[in-house]
Amino acid sequence: MGVALREVLTEYKHPRTWETLAGTAAIDGNNALYQFLSIIRQPDGTPLMNSEGRITSHLSGVFFRTLRFLEKGIRPVYIFDGKPPALKQETIESRREVRREAGVQWEAALARGDQEEAYKQARASSRVTPEIIATSKELLTLMGVPCVQAPSEGEAQAASMAASGAVTYAVSQDYDSLLFGAPLLVRNLTVSSKRRVQGRTIAVQPESIRLDEVLGGLGITREQLIEAGILIGTDFNPGIRGVGPKTALKIVKKDGFADMIAEKLPDFDPSPILQFFRSPPVIANLSLDWQPPDQAGIEDLLCGEYGFATERVRTALQKISGPPGQKTLDRWF
């Protein structure tokens, strides 16, 4: 879910066209997979599956979104979460319970014929399993796209790569990337121009947020941004009741973070969270290698193993590796 900073970041969001985003993008892989599993579903909430009952929603999302990236001159690198920090355990347990309850409500809605509620609850029950991650990595490898297994938080790894210049920007729907120090965050980088938010469909377009512009505009340091995040609540702590983004900013700008914690949460030590955002476990000096797609391998996986329509897969691949004279992938590899 990430830190709830949207309210104070609105004026720093800049609409972008796909054409202006050519470059190398570090994609929050787990975040992307969750989106695919949530959105790519049948009207009653059932995920897309092959004849054997194996979920294919994530593979469809990975395949077509990645092709769209490449077609638009974006070289993606998918970053996957490693071992979650102990700080996150409470959040993980809470999310697991939310998914479990959503699954129960999904079944109940189906039983009473309430398709709209069933779809809503099905989305909330989405779960990224080890098999889903493994098959996504397999597909990306066949597509010639590098995958990075982060030692801990994928967003932290993506932010580090953006800060070092290994990639042009980080891609995630969450704002944690800014707390981790990503100089440029891009959101809404999706194939569809629509998203479902709180039960309704809205039009969206890619947008970028520059960390230096945010800090300068708000008149704070990155350290104070992290402090504000902790006051509001992060994946590692619940925050202080009644403290939203605007109040949190006022507090940190007056150097009141420590006093507020001492007053409201006397038994809470924010030091481990501060340190984790400042210096999370990441892999430095990565060597990224893009390769031409293995069309036969892609067809074997998607069509042979998962039942995708062969013609649809071939047509999609043709868009980026088409006949002579057309734009091809060669310039990227």
From Swiss-Prot:
Entry similarity comment: Belongs to the XPG/RAD2 endonuclease family. FEN1 subfamily.
Organism: Methanosphaerula palustris (strain ATCC BAA-1556 / DSM 19958 / E1-9c)
Region of interest called Interaction with PCNA, as start-end residue ranges on this chain: 325-333
Manganese as UniProt keyword: no
Disulfide bonds: none
Region of interest (N-domain), ranges: 1-99
Cofactor requirements of the protein: Mg(2+)
Gene Ontology terms: biological process: DNA repair; DNA replication, removal of RNA primer
E.C. no: 3.1.-.-
Name of protein: Flap endonuclease 1
GO-annotated molecular function: 5'-3' exonuclease activity; 5'-flap endonuclease activity; DNA binding; magnesium ion binding
Region span, I-domain: 117-256
Binding residues annotated for Mg(2+) 1, in chain numbering: D28, D81, E153, E155
Cofactor-binding details, from the entry: Binds 2 magnesium ions per subunit. They probably participate in the reaction catalyzed by the enzyme. May bind an additional third magnesium ion after substrate binding.
PANTHER family in alphabetical order: FLAP ENDONUCLEASE 1 (PTHR11081:SF9), FLAP ENDONUCLEASE FAMILY MEMBER (PTHR11081)
Positions annotated to bind Mg(2+) 2: D174, D176, D235
Record keywords: DNA damage, DNA repair, DNA replication, Endonuclease, Exonuclease, Hydrolase, Magnesium, Metal-binding, Nuclease
Catalytic EC class: hydrolase
InterPro entries: 5-3_exonuclease_C_sf, Flap_endonuc, Flap_endonuc_arc, HhH2, PIN-like_dom_sf, XPG-I_dom, XPG/Rad2, XPG_CS
Task performed by this protein: Structure-specific nuclease with 5'-flap endonuclease and 5'-3' exonuclease activities involved in DNA replication and repair. During DNA replication, cleaves the 5'-overhanging flap structure that is generated by displacement synthesis when DNA polymerase encounters the 5'-end of a downstream Okazaki fragment. Binds the unpaired 3'-DNA end and kinks the DNA to facilitate 5' cleavage specificity. Cleaves one nucleotide into the double-stranded DNA from the junction in flap DNA, leaving a nick for ligation. Also involved in the base excision repair (BER) pathway.
Signal peptide: none
SMART domains: HhH2, XPGI, XPGN
Subunit structure: Interacts with PCNA. PCNA stimulates the nuclease activity without altering cleavage specificity.
